[in-house]
């Protein structure tokens, strides 16, 4: 089904409903108690500075109501205050950088240069990165990222380079995603998930679980175990697809069809609400699969290895945190968003 066909079918339905979850399978997310009003204000000020926003402006209010730092506070509920602030800045940067690299007002050459500069900064090569970026505003943002990474490196053990390498892949995939959008390529679901599981930015966030908690799983080869790989794959797909479910309306309004909803509609030649229901069902199936895999890890004896259950539970917390934050944040819903208590609702296209 071509994009124009999907557009006409979706337009005819005009609205869609996200159903409530039929079963509560994941652990309820708990907010890091150290992420207080002071930490939240620090993240908001950093975001304003990164985007050069006037406090109180519409964009600044939107960023505050998006509560980007809150995702870090839910996803890493047990880390110290010294860690949670740079982690929250990094996660906020992930969202802001995604917006910047999607900005049609930035020239393609500037876009390529800043993407390359970001990769170099993750490798600790800021001086070289600075030579690439001619746009002074983009250069200022690259420098701010470099400062966050220096702060983060004081707390994040990354001997294997897993965090750095996974972020390089994310930035590479952002460029591929941009190319697909420009050419209006409609991939099949497997190809889309190959892209989405990387552009979602989940891999570096899972790497931080190992590094921040200093579990040493990567160095001990534990992450190569098939059951751990399966847990990571399920968690990554769940986070990416739940995000697609929540962000669909915003992405569709921007003309971004690289979302699981239109991809499913294209594959199954179905309408909007049917595609939404399919996606919601896929998310729940992933939760069931995660719980089953977690039980396998326990019964196999793998859980007795030091740090394994800290990591597995950390992935589960990330899944639940992303789902919770998606309903709380105004990022996908707009200023003045009031989260529905049942985490379900009907939305107008």
UniProtKB/Swiss-Prot annotation:
| GO terms assigned for molecular function | metal ion binding; terpene synthase activity
Residues engaged in binding Mg(2+) 2: 98, 102
Keyword Ribonucleoprotein in annotation: no
**Residue numbers covered by motif DDXXD motif:** 98-102
Q: Which residues bind Mg(2+) 1?
A: 98, 102
**Which residues take part in binding Mg(2+) 3?**
243, 247
Classification via SUPFAM superfamilies:
Terpenoid synthases
> Which co-factor is required?
Mg(2+)
UniProt xrefs under PANTHER family: BETA-PINACENE SYNTHASE-RELATED, TERPENE SYNTHASE
The domain-related comment in the record is: The Asp-Asp-Xaa-Xaa-Asp/Glu (DDXXD/E) motif is important for the catalytic activity, presumably through binding to Mg(2+).
What's the family?
Answer: Belongs to the terpene synthase family.
Name of this protein: Microbial Terpene synthase-like protein 1
Annotated source species: Selaginella moellendorffii (Spikemoss)
Q: What is the lineage of its organism?
A: Eukaryota, Viridiplantae, Streptophyta, Embryophyta, Tracheophyta
